[in-house]
Structure formats: C-alpha cells, structure tokens
C-alpha cells in the first residue's frame, strides 16, 4: 500500500558528484522514512514533506561545501516518487526522468529542467535544424538543480496522479536517455510479464550493447504496479493530471540569450513553464549558476 524511491544524479566531477548525490539520497530518504511513521499525517501532507526534504538536502550540501572547499561547485538532481495505494506523488529537480508505461505508451511524467525542451521547441518552430537540435551541446545544461543555493524550479504536483494495475514506472538518471523512447518502450513491453527485474536487466544489456563512448553513469529503478481493486476510471490523460498547476519558480535563470528564446506567451504550456531570467545575489549583482558539466552564466560563463 505504500512505498517510495529516491534517486539523485551527482555532478561536479566524479568525487564531488558522488558526495552530492549521497547527501541528497541520504537526507531525502531519511526524512521520508521518519515522516511516514505517521501514515495518516504523511498522506495528508506529502507535498510539504517532499519539499522540506529537498530543502534539507540542499542546506546540507551548502554546509558540506563550506567545510570542504574541494567540493565547491558540486550539485545533484533529485527525483523521488511516493506511492500510497493508487496515488502517485513525486518531487523532481533537474533532468532525471520519471517514466510511466501504460497501455503500450511511454510518457515522462515529471518536468525536464534542462535546455532540451527549449531546443526541441526551436526545432519544431523551424528556428533550428533538426540535426543541430538533436546534437546541440547545451541540450543537457540544467535550468534547475540542487547546489546549496536557491532552487530555481521544483516539480511537485499538489494533487496525486492515479495509478492503475499494470502500470510500470521507471525512475532514472539521464544516462538511460542514451536509449530512445522507442527502445525503452519496446524493452518494457517485451519484458513486462517477467517483472521489474527482467525489465531492468534488459535495459542495462541494451545500454551495454549500445556501447556509446559518451555514455553517462546510469542508475534507475523499475516499479511494476499491481493492485487487487484497480480503479479503471483513471487514465494518464485525465483532466486531473493534465490540468495540474505547475509550480512557479522562486528564482529564474537565463540559460540562453534572450533573443534566442521564443516569447513564452507563444509557446506551448509544457515549454513555457521553463521561463528565463537572471539569478541575482543578495547584493543585486548577477551571479553565475552552476549547471551540469559546465558553468552557464549570464555573462557568457567560463
């Protein structure tokens, strides 16, 4: 009736990235375990618990960086789904995907806090050739991540998403996305009867066979949902899911030059959510924001 998973993808070099992801997983997992001891109270306030856990992990990362200067600049993504009977809650910061496989269709449930959605929109709008967009060096640059500073964007829906018996969830680091959605869909479908372990093993084998020299580290969890009294009235395209309100960012970033970004009013809602701006320090000065594998700063970066 109840369960959760916590996944974090670290960055900032091998050593610092490993520390960052361990801090996030340890803090969030511990908070969820502690708060869930009161089942009724936890279910009534899952969203606040998840956000508080993320804030706690972010503060711990800041404290660690202050006392260990060699890890300055480290950061980590976070995706943590919580399942209570047929209700799915989650918190997501960064680009680690949370996939749902239902009725032969794969869909990413959480927001992608990277420049990928911007670039894809520019390709669809004819502002960028498809091959350029597909291989764009900024595709994986993050617009939100845990780095011990203000969190730019948090995806944590107020209302739960309803699960159905037979649904399959895949929580992963972005290393899984070296496989196409079509490949992931095929593997999940072909191994669904074998359960979560069979799906996970086949995904790993496919990545090994791909043998991409640029392959990122990979971590994922596969969850197969089975319920005795499944509610057949809910589906992934229900108004309850489609109309959920997105969280407003506390601080916005300027990931690409303003003239290159389409007017949010003219963009689809899923893309327009990733708004642009400049992060400012307490003194009002524009400061760089550390994103995956590089500095992406308002003054051009390093």
Ranges and model annotations:
Residues 1-302:
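PP2C/PPM-type serine/threonine phosphatase catalytic domain
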